[in-house]
């Protein structure tokens, strides 16, 4: 209970930094679970660090700004407004956001920009198509019921499981990375 009160106070006073810390923690935990479920012999700390860093320093700030921009979309009919926001989110933001995550994740794996781009082209469509089976429902709940400062957190709670999937899909063995560490 004390931790919930602490988080509520932090979200009221410093929403971005609080959301960044929570996002990094949840994302790192999701990667740990993905590694465990894939029966990795040894825990890859660098892999977990990459996911945590990307989530806290890129995803959380991007979503923080995005949800505030999405709030500026106005309309008289609540149902139509929800559909409008959902379409903007899933057809404009989500494809770009997924691409940026995949590209940056590969850069954090010490891939070249060219190799990162090639891997993005290889993985993007399947990941985006799968995201359309999950995130529209999450966003309906988010946009209808969740206060603005809590939306990134709800996304990250769902992203705990999504990141397990993303981690599994994107962490194909890469020979030269293993020798780098």
From Swiss-Prot:
One of its GO terms (cellular component) is mitochondrial inner membrane. The chain crosses the membrane at residues 20-37, 51-67, 86-103, 152-169. Belongs to the peroxisomal membrane protein PXMP2/4 family. InterPro entries: Mpv17_PMP22 (IPR007248). It is a multi-pass membrane protein. One of its GO terms (biological process) is regulation of mitochondrial DNA metabolic process. It comes from the Eukaryota. It is found in: Mitochondrion inner membrane. This is Mitochondrial inner membrane protein Mpv17. Keywords: Membrane, Mitochondrion, Mitochondrion inner membrane, Transmembrane, Transmembrane helix.
């Amino acid at each position: 209970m004390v931790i919930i009160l602490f988080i509520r106070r932090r979200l009221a006073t410093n929403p971005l930094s609080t959301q960044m810390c929570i996002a990094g923690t949840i994302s790192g935990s999701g990667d740990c679970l993905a590694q465990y479920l894939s029966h990795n012999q040894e825990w890859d700390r660098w892999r977990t660090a990459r996911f945590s860093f990307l989530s806290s320093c890129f995803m959380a700030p991007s979503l923080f700004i995005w949800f505030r921009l999405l709030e500026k979309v106005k309309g008289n009919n609540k149902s139509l407004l929800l559909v409008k926001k959902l379409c903007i989110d899933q057809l404009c933001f989500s494809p770009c956001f997924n691409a940026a995550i995949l590209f940056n994740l590969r850069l954090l794996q010490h891939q070249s920009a060219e190799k990162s781009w090639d891997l993005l082209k290889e993985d993007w469509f399947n990941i985006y198509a799968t995201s359309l089976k999950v995130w529209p429902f999450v966003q309906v709940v988010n946009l209808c019921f969740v206060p603005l400062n809590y939306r990134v957190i709800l996304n990250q709670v769902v992203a705990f499981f999504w990141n397990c999937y993303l981690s599994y899909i994107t962490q194909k063995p890469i020979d030269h990375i293993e020798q780098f560490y």
